[in-house]
Amino acid sequence: MRGLLLPLMAAVLFAQPPARVQTGYDSIQASRLKADLTFLSSDALEGRRSLERGSEVAIQWIASEFAKAGLKPAAGDSYLQPVPLIEFTADRNLTTLTVTHDGKSETLRGADASAAFANEVSGSGAVVFAGFGITAPELNYDDYAGIDAKGKIVLIFNHEPQEADSNSSFNGKGNTRYANNNYKLFNAQRHGAIALVTMADPGHQGPLRGAPAAGAATPGRGGRGAAQAGARPRIPTEALADGGPSIPLFTIGARAADGLFEIAGKKAADVRSAIDMKPAPASFEIPGTRIEFKTATSDRRRADSYNVAGLIEGSDPALKAETVIFSAHFDHDGIGPNGIFHGADDNGSGTVGVVTLAHAFAANPVKPKRSILFIVFAAEERGLLGAYYYVSHPLRPLATTRVEINFDMIGRNETADPRVITEISPDTSNQLGLIGTHYSPDYRETVERQNKTVGLDLTYKWDLDAYNQVLFRSDQYPFLMHDIPGVWWFTGFHPDYHQVTDTVEKINFEKMTKILKLAYLSGFEFADAAGGPKLQPRAKAM
């Protein structure tokens, strides 16, 4: 009797999807996911490293699947949007900052001052300290208020104010979109700075995230590419040849930072505390001081990768001009000294997810009212480059892009990883993390409503995690910076993350199937709802 009751109880607990979306929903099958992911993470694709042969195979495979599904090419008459890249190695010895005060100069390099900038540039100017480098009108906070950064070098803290304060006007123990150094670099550029210099936030004990360093494999990435020492191949840095920042970002060590504050008669920790008290900016010019900077590179080459994009046009004459996006990234880490970095979970799983949903929506007789763009980004492991390029060169207008569902690592169960500090539930076999829903309660409510059919265990813990700074570490972040509700769907870290052991036999295909069914239902609701989910600028995780 017990065995008969369990299926009946499950049927009561989880409703069936509406008949109008049933065909596409039923087409999402674990067997297809396994076949596709087995290919995408196979030795033949050589780890899909950006600008190498394996990534080109992945690009062509994704495009061919979009064509088989009958998607409309989204990049003119092609599925491929070129992403112009510069690959280079930063010269740690010739990349320098020279600080001059009272006629005395000191040149900093290496561990004291580093940068990874694609162009070889030099310049000099006065120095201003601009707090955390944040301009947030909705929070009534502007570190640039009262200072003139034009033609100057701007020094800032990493992170954001009140990170340990649950009552913060920012996001307390989580992050807002302003804590990322790539945002701060563009903000400094908008204020006329000629270079940005970041230093460790003296009030934050976590790792210095999101700061490109000379020779770093993932500039601006926020550390998501970190791996165990010696295990990961040494990979040249990549940057956008078009659409990236035009000024360099330097990171300086504690000794150099303390010296600059000493010139101003201040201590960094005291200034940090003063900002936190209100919070209010405490910016100032560092008197009688100039910095001369120089960046240098080697092994520089220009090449294109590609975002792969296909479209299902909406069925509603008015709403089809609006867009719902499903995204992932296809690139990984290539071949290292220990073998091939297969990237089954990261991010073969997300790539297969987007392709699977393209087939599901195409197979469903009833089409969504809004148009749906399926896009798989290039060079995410190199700094979200494909996504950043897209938002500066959109294939569909950003103003009418309503929402993004971004898949990155949706195939595993979260397990303890010594590189990641987080609390883990005793059972993660049915768990899905949603990162960034604190910016859109409407988004969260939609997914939770559709989850009544699927029955996953949803967690929002990463929105309260300033330490690992996951908000900035996948392709939804550039959309969030353009006020588009973008959420990263993520099943969590594990010891195989960025290791050669991230292989297909470890994927939980049953859970991955449920995640894609939930995304399908959520995507349909986003596409058919009277209005899109609203972005809440004053984000606060609960």
Predicted regions and their residues:
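Second-shell loop/turn segments in exported
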Residues: 20-27, 43-53, 114-118, 129, ...
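Extracellular/luminal Protease-associated
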Residues: 107-248, 313, 341-342, 346, ...
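His/Asp/Glu-rich mid-to-C-terminal helical/loop segments that flank catalytic regions of hydrolases
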Residues: 359, 363, 490-542
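Metal-dependent peptidase/peptidase-like ectodomains
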Residues: 104-110, 119-120, 145, 151, ...
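N-terminal hydrophobic or amphipathic helices/low-complexity stretches enriched
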Residues: 15-74, 256, 321-323, 536
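Noncatalytic luminal/extracellular "stalk/propeptide" segments of secretory-pathway proteins
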Residues: 46-167, 285-289, 294-296, 300, ...
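Structural recognition of the beta-strand scaffold that forms the well-ordered cores
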Residues: 38-41, 81-82, 127-130, 153-157, ...
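Soluble metallo-hydrolase cores and metallopeptidase-like ectodomains found primarily
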Residues: 21, 100-146, 239-343, 359, ...
